[in-house]
Amino acid sequence: MNPVRQPYDLAAPAPNGMRRGRTTGSCATAAVKAALMLLLDGVDADEVFISLPDPDFYLAVPVESVAWLDENTVRAEVLKYAGDDPDNTDGATIFAEVKLNSSGALRFLAAPGVGMVTQPGLRIPPGEPAINPVPRQMMRMAVDEVLAGRPDPGIDLAIGCVDGDKIAKRTFNPMLGIVGGISILGTSGIVEPMSQAAWIASIEVYVRVALGELPPAIAFTPGKIGRGYAADTLGLEKKQVVQIANFVGDSLDFAESVLIEQGRILDTLWVLGHPGKIAKLLDGVWDTHSGKSGMAMDAVAGVAADLGYPSELVAQIKQANTVENVVQIMNSQPDTRGYWMEIERRTAARMATKVPSVRQVAVRLFSMDGTPLGEAA
């Protein structure tokens, strides 16, 4: 553990007053660390410290149990805690079964309850367990911390979830081609409560703060993708960038209401993010949560058809697993900037109908790794 890291205070409420939680990635990382501590050092821990992706912080995570399964394997369990976020995995038992291997490599495996990726278009390739990149990085860091400079003998990390196959049925995983269980997720290690009415109300507060000093422009981002563009290219201050989660319609309504109160016209409202969320607006969807709206395959395929792309490509887009898969499909074409620019134009026009006090709504789309797709490319 890096001594300069500070403890992350999970008990401190989020800006909207709601409780934060631990991601499945943090839980799995804690289980890995606890299991490896017993396997290598004989330490039976009831709490472990894990390094968060933010280099300034570590997180203390209680360990529910840790025990030898056999003479070669240790299993540790951690309970998922989602805070006030309505997470299907809240209270689930996330576990890691850890043993040494002779390969000299760290291997990620799916234990019962964690799904396997079967289709392209996700951040993990087919044939791999549904453990996302950041949780994998966190687990690698935990392994390095326990090894503490000792040679790496090769370690198998089998990550699972009790009743994960049942929990997964209440998620988007079956439609995404993730079979057999849940995904191990998280980009920060911390669950920021985003889906309750209290979060929607907090968006109005953030919008008011963003517009409070009468700036000529602000930005909405469904997630973290696009924040760098807002700061580095658009020159927006942090407080002028509002993370709106899935609540596009509510956020636009709040912006219009505040602008009416201020009696002014906003020059530009930027909407920055991944087309997986934003393209749903082509279907007139204002709440982009996966539980309330489907994926926008027909709509993005329709744009391709309107632009005269070959019918075979249009059919391939329709059958894509995710919109990120569409990004990959379109990367095989010689010039797709115009395609994404048309999606930007159409979604911006749709949003503009809700904010007549905004002179220009401008959309900029980015792939999952932050690569600009349309106008910004």
Swiss-Prot record:
Gene3D superfamilies: CbiD-like (3.30.2110.10). It catalyses: Co-precorrin-5B + S-adenosyl-L-methionine = Co-precorrin-6A + S-adenosyl-L-homocysteine. The keyword Manganese does not apply. Its EC number is 2.1.1.195. Residues 1-21 are annotated as: Disordered. Pathway: Cofactor biosynthesis; adenosylcobalamin biosynthesis; cob(II)yrinate a,c-diamide from sirohydrochlorin (anaerobic route): step 6/10. Keywords: Cobalamin biosynthesis, Methyltransferase, S-adenosyl-L-methionine, Transferase. GO terms for molecular function: cobalt-precorrin-5B C1-methyltransferase activity. The keyword Methyltransferase applies. InterPro entries: CbiD, CbiD_sf. One of its GO terms (biological process) is methylation. HAMAP family: CbiD. Belongs to the CbiD family. NCBIfam families: cbiD. This is Cobalt-precorrin-5B C(1)-methyltransferase. It comes from Chromobacterium violaceum (strain ATCC 12472 / DSM 30191 / JCM 1249 / CCUG 213 / NBRC 12614 / NCIMB 9131 / NCTC 9757 / MK).
